[in-house]
Each structure stands twice: as C-alpha cells, then as structure tokens.
Amino acid sequence: MAFCAGYFLRKYLAEAKIASAEAQAKKILEEAEKEAEAKKREAILEAKEEVLKLRNDMERENRERRLELQRLERRLVQKEETLDRKVDAIEKKEDALNRKEAEIDAIKAQLNEIYKKQLSELERISGMTSEEAKQALLSDIEKEIQHEAAMLIKEIESKAREEGEKRARDIISLAIQRCAADHVAEATVSVIPLPSDEMKGRIIGREGRNIRAFETLTGIDLIIDDTPEAVILSGFDPIRREVARIALEKLIVDGRIHPARIEEMVEKAQKEVNVQIRDAGEQAVFETGVHGLHPELVTLLGRLKFRTSYGQNVLKHSIEVAHLAGLMASEIGVDIQMAKRAGLLHDIGKAVDHEVEGPHVAIGIDLAKKYREAQEIIHAIAAHHGDEEPKSIIAVLVQAADAISAARPGARRETLEAYIKRLTKLEEIANSFDGVEKSYAIQAGREVRIMVKPEKIDDLGAIRLVREITKKIENELDYPGQIKVVIIRETRVVEYAK
C-alpha cells in the first residue's frame, strides 16, 4: 500500500510539474511572440521613417538642383544678351573702321600725289635727283654722327685716363708709404784699419812677397800708401774684395803673415763669404715671404749682397722691389706671392753678369728657365727694363716697382758733375734737330720735353722726329734706366671780337 501510495504521489507530483512547466513554457512563448510582434512593428515603423526621411532629402536636393539650374539658365541668358550686345558693338566698330580706312586710303593717295609734285618741284629747283639728295643728307648725318662719336670717345678716354692715373698714383703712393727702405752708401773700395804703421811692412813682406801672394790669391789690389794706420783694398769684384777684407783682417789679428798663412786665411775667408752669401739669400727669402726657390737661386740672391748698381745694393734693391710689387698687387687684387717672387728675382742676372757674357736681363731669363721658374716670372724678368713689351699685370708691377726703387731719393748715386753733363747733353741732342724750338730735361734726366715749331713740324713729322731723337740719345748718351721723350706741338690762333 505504501508503495502504491508513493507511486501515485510521485506520479501526481510529476504530472503537476509537467503541467506547471507547460504552462510556464506557454507563457514564455506568448511573451516572446508579443515581444517579436512589438519589435516587428518597431522595425516597420523605423523603416517607414527612414523611407520618409530619404524621400524628404531627395525632394530637397531636387528643389536645390532646380533652383541652381534656374540660376544657371538666368546667367546663361544674361551672357547671351551681353555677347549679342558686344557682337553688335564690334560690327559697328568694324563698319566705322572700314569707313576710316577708306578715308585714310583716300588721304594717302592725295598725299602721295602732293609728295610727287613737291619732289618734282624740288628736283627742278635744286638740280639734284632724290637719290643724290638722299646721299648728301646721309653724308652730312654720317659726318655729324662721326664727330659726336669722336668727341664722346675722347671724353670717355680722358675720364678713363684721369681715373686710371689717379688710381695708379694712389696705389704707388700707398705702396711707397708702407715700404720703409734704407738709403744706401756707395761702396767701391774697402778700407782696413791697422793697429800701427809697422803692420804695413809685415803685410808687404820681404821683397814684397806677401803682398804679391795676397793679390795673386784674392785677385784684389792691395794699396798701401801714406794713409796712417790703414790700407785700401780695390777691385771690381765685390765678392773677391770681401774675401780679401776678411782674410787681411784675420792676418792682422793673427800677426803671422807669410805666403802659406795668407793662402790658409784666404781659404777660410772664402768659406765664410760662402756662408754669408747663403745666409743673405735665405734672409732675403724669409724677409719677403717667398718660398720654394731652388737652392741655387737662393745662393745667387745672396751674391747680390756684394753687387751694387749706381751705388745701390742690388740685394736690398731686389727686396725693396719685391715688397713694392707685393703691396701694389694687394691693392689691385693680383697674386701677391707671384708679384713678390718676380720682384725678388728680377735682377738675379746681376749675380753672375761679371762672369757670364751678355746683359743681366738675358742672363736672368736663362737662370729662371734653368731652375724651372714659372713663365710669368720669366716674362717679368724679361720686361722689367723694356726689352720686351709687358704682357701681364705682374710684369707691369715689377717694372713700376723697379723704377720706384731706383728713382727714390738716395737710392742711387752719381757724381754731380756727371749728372749735370748728362742733362746738358740730353738737351743739346734735342736742340740739334731742325724745327725744335726749345727743350727741357726734367725728372732728374729721366724725361725730356721738346717744344717744336708747328709751322715746320706737322703731326707725322712729330712722330718721325721723336723716333730720331730717341735713336740719337740711345747712340750718344750713357744713362741708367730709360728716358721718356715727349714732343709738344702747339698751334695757337688768336682773334679779337670788337
């Protein structure tokens, strides 16, 4: 019974649960259906709203497009109306232009007829054809233009010359001011002081053997006269004279004077002079800032220390020219080192011109070529005395610096008598030619100005005369550097207005 009761109870409970579950499921299903129906209605409503919105947007866009099209149509109509008005205006202008052209053609025809009549009348009156008159007019115009052009060219040349001369004076004066140079003293002989006159006898030696040995070894004349406590060394070679001076001073200090000792001292003096030469060359290179010279050229520069020209030490002159050329080069923007190098080497031929035949310019050119100097340096050496026409700015600068160094006060010396004779002779040569009225030697004899009679000497005659005078000066007169010959021909015409 209990089993059966439990069975039925469990069955009843199960059926009750099933019924409850079914009822709950049915309820859930109904709620889901209701919710789905609500969402469906909501979706349909949203879709309808979207469609309505799209329809409104399209209608708005269509309205805007219609309005834009209406505006474009109105603008197009306005442009067409404007274009029509312009076309009408152009057509009217063309008609007016055609009428004007017709009027102008008629006027041209009338003018042409009048011109022909006037031309015929002018030809009849003047007796010239139109072509002849045209040529005469062109000839007059050409002459007038040529005259104006010549005047303009002359004015431009004059201004350029004035500006160039002013600039050149400024450059040269600045270079001279910045270059401090010594005044040189002429050295033709060497005077050796003696401790006493007894030393003269020892220098002469028994039967003159010491003095003969000394002169033979040095090639220098040893002059012993009445000058108290001094002897004189005389010779044309300054290097040999310096060797003799050093050797004699050493002998005097040593006191042992005989041929063997003289030979020994001369050899020592020669070595000392060689050292002096080398040192002088190196000092010159250092002082001017010129580098890369061949060692032999440095030695040759040192030899210039013992070389003089009109009393001016050639090495000091070369250093001065190098400085002047460099300073002027810096003012005009030219290679300063090249200018200094050319200035330092311009007189290098004078180092050996007493040993080698030929002028020092030609010797200098050969030396520069031998030691592979630049062509510009070689040309500057060749042109510094006018043997060649200067073709580079460096050559012109070296030529100018050389002239400045040689011409400055105190640089070179001549006796007063020789100076006066040279200037007098210069004026006599100029006055010896027919047609010369008077002449003046100026610039310390470096320029002669000659006044000629214009009725006897014309322009071509002046050219011939200056060449003849120059040639006669070269043949008959000895002078340093060069002389500028200037002929002045002046014609004066005077009339009085009353």
UniProtKB/Swiss-Prot annotation:
A GO molecular-function annotation: RNA endonuclease activity
Detail the disulphide connectivity of this chain as listed in its UniProt entry. Answer: none
Q: Name one Pfam family in it.
A: KH_1
Q: What is its EC number?
A: 3.1.-.-
SMART domains referenced in this protein's UniProt entry, alphabetically: HDc, KH
Tell me where in this chain the HD domain is found.
314-407
Tell me which residues make up the KH domain. Answer: 188-273
Cross-referenced InterPro entries, in alphabetical order? HD/PDEase_dom, HD_domain, HDIG_dom, KH_dom, KH_dom_type_1, KH_dom_type_1_sf, Ribonuclease_Y, RNase_Y_N
**NCBIfam families recorded:** HDIG, RNase_Y
Record-stated family: Belongs to the RNase Y family.
Report what the protein is called: Ribonuclease Y
